């Protein structure tokens, strides 16, 4: 089996090295990742300039593009053999609830949705790498176990691992996405020449972290696994809107 590994923290990030090391003796792994940190890139594709893959001394491929660019090229001709699976991560930082809309880590996995096997996105709830071995352990276990799992086509499994040593993890839970409140206001800055600018501020506080959500699971010390799909159709709204257009046109 061939696995394409990518991330959004960049090709030199410790998380992708930990993920590659965890999977290297399980499958043939190819790493294609952004040349620099592209956190928050979501599913952006680069359309205004050419992409230039560059082979690194460790065998990884660095790309001057987004996480989705990396997987897109990896599945569509850059490699001699098409990968069987896409695994993204290990992200340093949570991808919970609404975070999945912005996450390059999750987007890289979503770009692998066309393959027969489920794609995975792994995140550790820390900006520090100390507990990457915990996340790598669960990455290996879950990727190995996918062969016993029958899922609908185009399923992505979003996995968030608490920032704990392995022996302190309480277990694994299947979850739904929670929700955040509106993000904090952007932070205004002024450069020495008087030009104003803004930094995007912190994500919103947890609004729905009730039992059954990914937020609740990780706060209780459990690894959270949330199945995702691309279809964002709001079916309940469709039912509510039934007949609405007839009264307008």
Swiss-Prot record:
Q: Which Gene3D superfamilies match?
A: Survival protein SurE-like phosphatase/nucleotidase
Q: List the disulfide bonds.
A: none
Lineage per the UniProt record: Bacteria, Pseudomonadati, Pseudomonadota, Gammaproteobacteria, Pseudomonadales
Name assigned to this protein: 5'-nucleotidase SurE
What residues bind a divalent metal cation, as annotated?
A: 8-9, 39, 91
- Reactions catalysed: a ribonucleoside 5'-phosphate + H2O = a ribonucleoside + phosphate
Chain's role? Nucleotidase that shows phosphatase activity on nucleoside 5'-monophosphates.
Query: Which cofactor does the UniProt annotation name?
Result: a divalent metal cation
Q: Which organism is it from?
A: Ectopseudomonas mendocina (strain ymp) (Pseudomonas mendocina)
Q: Which InterPro entries match?
A: SurE (IPR030048), SurE-like_Pase/nucleotidase (IPR002828), SurE-like_sf (IPR036523)
Q: Would you indicate the residue range of the signal peptide? A: none
